Amino acid sequence: MKFLLYNIRYGTGKYLIKRFKHIRGYLGRSEKHIDRIGKFIRRQKPDIVGLVEVDLGSFRMKSKNQAEILSEMTDKNFIYQYKYEENSRYMKFPIVRKQGNALLSNKEIVNHKFHYLDNGMKKLIIEIETNGVVIFLVHLALGGKTRMKQFVQLFSLIEKCDKPMIVAGDFNTLWGTEEIELFMKAGKLKSANLERKPTFPSWSPKKELDFVLHSKNIKINDVKVIKTMLSDHLPILIDFDII
């Protein structure tokens, strides 16, 4: 079975413009670029896909939902959720309120839950069960102290799971991978990326921000950090078996 993790940066591509690169790139149209991302995903032939930073219908996409488009392009079931809770002040802003994360699967998504952590701006956790495995898709805060609080709460979610499990996403471990090691030890999780290949930025990878962690009843057969410039992050593709 194959699982692909990819922070797609709302389909706006990597930083292409030197001046005001972050703002102009963030606001860029993404309708054409999302087609390239869909074709890339299709070529990898994953069974399950975890997508971080998905545009769910802002002006960048002319109100079209990237999760729906990618599910159609890859012929998969899908589930998505907005990053911010309904009563959050961030939901008042036109672009921000259409930002979210999504999961695609070639099999039925039999259960799903949306968890919002207590701290931070980035605090959505999507939990699904599909293909005999439970997936937790995360995108953690940029602030280190906030991340530490989020790790504690994330652990309280995963410790209740007694099924084969993958915890994957953009953990934003800007302080280094050491900050995730205590969480992994407490949760009895291993990283699929044993060589600690960096995933950010895509054009000159220096930091390992994206992780695919797994429980002991999952055996990793192969892992690839794929070099592609479709986003500012590199995708991770794993081949695994449930044992």
Each model region followed by its residue ranges:
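Active-site environment of divalent metal-dependent phosphoester hydrolases
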Residues: 11-12, 56-59, 86-88, 143-146, ...
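Active-site beta-strand/loop signature of hydrolases that rely on acidic residues for catalysis
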Residues: 2-7, 36-61, 135-138, 154-181, ...
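Charged helix-capping and loop-helix junction motifs
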Residues: 63-68, 149-155
